[in-house]
């Protein structure tokens, strides 16, 4: 994945955290990563572990490995302009029980910064305590979990609620990426709270 930002684009000068671990759905990491680069931002891969992480393709086949830029324990939300959370069942299941990841996610909401989550990534939003009263979407199997956590779940390709962008699956990536760039370009959302 490229890390060079386009200097003449709407996100020039912005830095975006991508929170992922082993088992991340590869296209849900690489597609938004390339979209923010094309829009001028610098993406940073944040993970519970240092070194590299290995992606999956459709949760079954091993994908490529990606170099971690910083650990979630060392990362601080104030150093980023927004957060993207790719899915992948294994990735999301590991991330949602990681206390450092939960705190990192919650800090973006407390600082009113844009957050984007696709597929199974909203599991971590539940554990971070930031979905109650929110309108969002996810992979359909998370519907009950999100409703039980107080969210209003809808079946739409992309949903934006005060700086929180969510989508259902890789099929929604074009719409997801466009909204990620739009929300990041708008900057802080004062109604984005934990």
Describe each region flagged by the PLM:
Residues 136:
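Anionic-ligand binding patches
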């Amino acid at each position: 994945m490229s890390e060079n930002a386009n200097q003449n684009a709407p996100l020039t000068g912005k830095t975006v955290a991508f929170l992922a671990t082993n088992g991340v759905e590869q296209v849900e990491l690489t597609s938004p990563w390339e979209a923010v680069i094309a829009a001028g931002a610098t993406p940073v891969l944040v993970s519970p572990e240092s070194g590299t992480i290995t992606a999956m393709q459709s949760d079954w086949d091993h994908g490529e490995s990606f170099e971690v830029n910083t650990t979630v324990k060392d990362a601080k939300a104030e150093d980023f302009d927004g957060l993207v959370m790719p899915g992948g069942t294994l990735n999301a299941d590991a991330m949602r029980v990681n206390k450092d990841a939960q705190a990192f996610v919650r800090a973006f909401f407390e600082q009113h910064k844009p957050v984007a989550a696709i597929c199974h990534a909203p599991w971590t939003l539940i554990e971070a305590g930031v979905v109650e009263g929110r309108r969002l979407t996810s992979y359909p199997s998370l519907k009950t979990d999100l409703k039980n956590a107080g969210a209003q779940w809808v079946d739409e390709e992309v949903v934006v609620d005060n700086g929180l962008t969510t989508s259902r699956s890789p099929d929604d990536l074009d719409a997801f990426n466009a909204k990620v760039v739009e929300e990041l370009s708008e900057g802080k959302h004062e109604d984005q709270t934990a």
